[in-house]
Amino acid sequence: IPADNYPCATDYITQMKDMIQILLEKGKAYKHDDGSIYFKISSFQDYGKLSNIKTNNKKPNSRIISDEYDKNNVQDFVLWKAWKVDDGDIYWDSPWGKGRPGWHIECSAMSKATLGSHFDIHCGGVDNIFPHHENEIAQSKCANGKNFVNYWLHSEFLMLNDTKMSKSLGNYYTIQDLKKMNFSSESI
């Protein structure tokens, strides 16, 4: 069944910047000296519910360098990465300076634009539960002021010889490969 929409992240940069601005205005995010914008995890009391993690085991106000960007707290995550010379021409102008959106804000902005600020089912692999889906919940709920998703469905990895099947590892089979190995259509 073909999808109704095939969203491309770069088509939603304006919506991403708008969502970041809302989070800044609500005090859920902050701007670092270099122009990067971070989500303040401590501002969202339900953080960790999906993944069942506790955020109080990290040292508050510790400073680290993550993905080459400073932040005020080890738990905070990037919403907007300030441009650096090494980024070349990969940037967009924003009220905070040149930069690019973080991975998590891309998904929140695209889903809001295509599905609305609240929808029923969100799917992904188990490797997306933390931090990606946890961060999507935090920023979406804080920006929109309501529940983001009713049901989360996460698929497990396909295993092949006790190793995760992965294109990057080259240990995968296509449907055609499985048919040649006499697997039935029902089992595929």
Question: Where are the regions a protein language model picked out?
Answer:
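Divalent metal-dependent hydrolysis catalytic cores, especially in the metallo-beta-lactamase
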Residues: I1-A9
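Alpha-helical recognition segments enriched in aromatics with Gly/Pro capping
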Residues: T14-I188
